[in-house]
């Protein structure tokens, strides 16, 4: 099968959509299919492999470091025709997503759309009234989904919300998987030595973008209480984003400031030692469609304390692989303190977390499921 993946963000930009696209591309290639990525040009010169086609782009005015593709290119439209793609898979409902739809329709090929993002939660990036932008975003995304031949939802809750919005297209739940050979339990002491971390300190970890919608300030606030209750506790935050400066100011003002460290952006293939070194994963976002970093943490045998929210509660099994709380700093802190002080319970959750990741979030298995959907669309055996 020959698949075109059309995305508004891709490497070297890091985020959930980029990870999902690259996981799918690698998995398809590993299973004998061919996949090409159509993405915006990066802001700096960047060497790309032959499977990447870059559209001209402009800097996003409200998100430093993000490029917005100009979704018109005769050259790449011609390339898409010459590739003789079987499937056009859009990752967004606008810009290159619209390009994917146009090319799919002109060539009589199926259009697949993955609903990666709760777009109404990102309205603050558009310099217009947030309620207006949020409403328009929901309408645009649901209309685009309704025109697709298949809509992929990363979680059952997202599938339900799309149906509630009146999307009539067929919807399939296919979460982004985790490469289990990369993300796996490891030696905690060795991981800490590799990263230059104290081998004995109780370590809390956050991995993800440092953007407003991720509510990382709640993690930092909770850690202030954690540090008072758990002797020697440390917090390590991995990632970068538009809210980073504000979060660093918040960390400096925290009574636990000396115990908080920002590690910056880390390539996905270099993340496993961070998960392996930690004792507990902290997560407070309420805007996820899946919560991929939670699946990565679980694959490494790391339990999580997270705010109960759509997508998150389909990865973290409350009381089994971690704990889910209300969106409250002290409740988040209390749950984390309880687990940090209960090593046997944490160990049991670690085993359950790895088992859950292996059964429900294997990248190889999820790509196989996706390929089955592709085959049905082109009329082949599932």
Regions found by a protein language model. Give the residues of each.
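Aromatic "clamp/platform" in nucleotide-sugar-dependent glycosyltransferases that forms part
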Residues: 286
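Conserved acidic donor-binding segment of nucleotide-sugar-dependent glycosyltransferases
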Residues: 317-319, 323-330, 338-344
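Short hydrophobic beta-strand element within catalytic cores of glycosyltransferases
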Residues: 294, 303-306
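Nucleotide-activated donor-binding/catalytic signature segment of Leloir-type glycosyltransferases, i.e.
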Residues: 246-266
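N-terminal subdomain of nucleotide-sugar transferases
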Residues: 1-54
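Donor nucleotide-sugar binding/catalytic pocket of nucleotide-sugar-dependent glycosyltransferases
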Residues: 39, 56, 134, 138-188
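Conserved donor-binding/catalytic core segment of Leloir-type glycosyltransferases
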Residues: 198-224, 236
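Short alpha-helical donor nucleotide-sugar binding micro-motif in glycosyltransferases
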Residues: 145, 265-266, 273-278
């Amino acid at each position: 099968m020959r698949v075109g993946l059309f995305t508004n963000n891709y490497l070297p930009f890091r985020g959930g959509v980029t990870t999902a696209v690259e996981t799918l591309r690698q998995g398809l290639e590993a299973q004998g299919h061919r996949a090409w990525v159509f993405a915006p040009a990066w802001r700096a010169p960047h060497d790309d492999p032959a499977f990447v086609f870059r559209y001209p782009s402009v800097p996003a005015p409200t998100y430093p470091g993000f490029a917005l593709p100009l979704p018109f290119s005769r050259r790449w439209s011609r390339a898409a025709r010459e590739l003789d793609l079987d499937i056009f898979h859009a990752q967004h409902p606008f810009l290159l997503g619209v390009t994917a739809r146009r090319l799919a329709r002109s060539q009589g090929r199926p259009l697949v759309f993955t609903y990666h993002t709760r777009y109404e939660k990102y309205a603050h990036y558009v310099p217009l009234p947030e309620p207006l932008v949020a409403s328009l975003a929901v309408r645009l995304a649901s209309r685009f989904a309704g025109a697709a031949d298949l809509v992929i939802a990363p979680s059952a809750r997202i599938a339900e919300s799309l149906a509630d919005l009146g999307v009539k297209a067929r919807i399939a739940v296919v979460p982004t998987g985790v490469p289990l050979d990369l993300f796996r339990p490891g030696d905690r002491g060795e991981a800490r030595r590799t990263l230059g971390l104290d081998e004995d300190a109780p370590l809390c970890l956050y991995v993800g973008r440092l953007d407003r919608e991720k509510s990382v300030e709640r993690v930092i606030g909770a850690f202030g209480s954690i540090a008072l209750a758990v002797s020697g506790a440390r917090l390590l935050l991995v990632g970068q984003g538009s809210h980073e400066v504000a979060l660093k100011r918040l960390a400096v003002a925290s009574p636990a400031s000396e115990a908080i460290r920002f590690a910056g952006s880390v390539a996905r293939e270099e993340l496993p030692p961070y998960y392996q070194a930690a004792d507990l994963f902290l997560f407070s976002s309420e805007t996820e469609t899946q919560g991929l970093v939670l699946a990565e943490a679980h694959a490494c045998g790391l339990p999580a304390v997270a705010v109960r929210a759509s997508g998150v509660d389909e990865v973290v099994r409350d009381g089994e692989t971690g704990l889910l709380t209300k969106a409250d700093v002290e409740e988040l802190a209390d749950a984390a303190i309880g687990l940090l002080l209960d090593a046997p319970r944490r160990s049991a959750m670690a085993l359950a977390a790895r088992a859950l990741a292996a059964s429900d979030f294997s990248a190889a298995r999820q790509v196989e499921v996706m390929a089955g959907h592709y085959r049905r669309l082109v009329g082949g055996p599932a």
